[in-house]
């Protein structure tokens, strides 16, 4: 018990010291030169931060969701060794059904249409 108390005390103390030092050390002095974009030594012709397509963002979110689905369903073949393999199958089917319904909804709303 003393070891846990010691570790927690050291952790809290170290965190407080590092947070305090991080507020004291930096001398922030933003000027026009630091805030301007840098493009290989040339003056920028336009805005350095161009907006990207919202459709690209939606496709990226869908990719992440289905990538997560694959990661969740990858250990499914070993699910038959659990105590209740039918419960594992029911949960995995529910996850697949929910993601399929979401994909169908996105498709019907036109979210997957790249060109208008």
Curated annotation (Swiss-Prot):
Record key words, sorted: Electron transport, Membrane, Mitochondrion, NAD, Respiratory chain, Translocase, Transmembrane, Transmembrane helix, Transport, Ubiquinone
Enzyme class: translocase
Record's keyword annotation contains Electron transport: yes
Cystines in this chain: none
Annotated TM spans: 3-23, 56-76, 87-107
EC number of this enzyme: 7.1.1.2
MF-aspect GO terms: NADH dehydrogenase (ubiquinone) activity
Secretion signal, residue range per the UniProt entry: none
Chemical reaction(s) catalysed: a ubiquinone + NADH + 5 H(+)(in) = a ubiquinol + NAD(+) + 4 H(+)(out)
InterPro entries, alphabetized: NADH_UbQ/plastoQ_OxRdtase_su3, NDAH_ubi_oxred_su3_sf
One GO CC term on file: mitochondrial membrane
Subcellular location: Mitochondrion membrane
Annotated Gene3D superfamilies: NADH:ubiquinone/plastoquinone oxidoreductase, chain 3
Membrane topology qualifier: Multi-pass membrane protein
Known function: Core subunit of the mitochondrial membrane respiratory chain NADH dehydrogenase (Complex I) that is believed to belong to the minimal assembly required for catalysis. Complex I functions in the transfer of electrons from NADH to the respiratory chain. The immediate electron acceptor for the enzyme is believed to be ubiquinone.
Family membership: Belongs to the complex I subunit 3 family.
PANTHER family xref list: NADH-UBIQUINONE OXIDOREDUCTASE CHAIN 3 (PTHR11058:SF9)
Protein name according to UniProt: NADH-ubiquinone oxidoreductase chain 3
Native organism: Oncorhynchus kisutch
Gene: MT-ND3
């Amino acid at each position: 018990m003393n070891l846990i108390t010691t570790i927690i005390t050291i952790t809290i103390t170290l965190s407080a010291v590092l947070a305090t030092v991080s507020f004291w050390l930096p001398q922030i002095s933003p000027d026009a030169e630091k805030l301007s974009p840098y493009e290989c030594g040339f003056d920028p012709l336009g805005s350095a931060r161009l907006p990207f397509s919202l459709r690209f963002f939606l496709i990226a979110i869908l990719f992440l969701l289905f990538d997560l689905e694959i990661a969740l369903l990858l250990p499914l073949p070993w699910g038959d060794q659990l105590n209740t393999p039918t419960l594992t199958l029911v949960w995995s089917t529910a996850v697949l059904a929910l993601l399929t319904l979401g994909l169908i909804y996105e498709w019907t709303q036109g979210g997957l249409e790249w060109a208008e």
